[in-house]
């Protein structure tokens, strides 16, 4: 992950910098973080994902901690981490859920710390495919995917500065690719923010 490698290059010395992976799933970003010299922590609401993450950490002898926790209520003290990452978790839920998750990431991030968050763009093919629950929020009705029935919130470019307004610096770019025989556009925001 480009963000982790770039961040590690900016940090002085071999100190174990604490990194939190919110929505860690099977722990793939924790593995890379550990290889780069971070002290990784991961949280997820999926016990299956956490079980896979624990097994991966044991197989690679990586010293890492994982815990069951919601992205909207993290079990850590303020300013606990040098870096926070969340790849594709914050958009599951309403606008309020996304705002709470971003606020929690900010809360646990140390002053000068950096975060990397991947959010869905309103240009994504999933946008508008399902029951509308609010502005840019839908219960997806796409059959044949593991996202059927999930609630997702999408952002336009002009929304990002407001959602990340508590951060001192915010940069974002769009990443797009196609799947399903090049018929389905995936469109995500790659957001880096500094406290």
Q: Where do the protein language model's features map onto the residues?
A:
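Conserved catalytic-core motifs of eukaryotic protein kinase domains, centered on the activation segment
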Residues: 95-97, 128
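A short beta-strand submotif of the Rossmann-like class I SAM-dependent methyltransferase core
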Residues: 86-89
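A short glycine-rich, Lys/Arg-flanked "PGG" loop and its adjoining helix->strand segment in the class I
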Residues: 99-111
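Class I (Rossmann-like) S-adenosyl-L-methionine-dependent methyltransferase catalytic domain
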Residues: 1-19, 25-73, 116-195
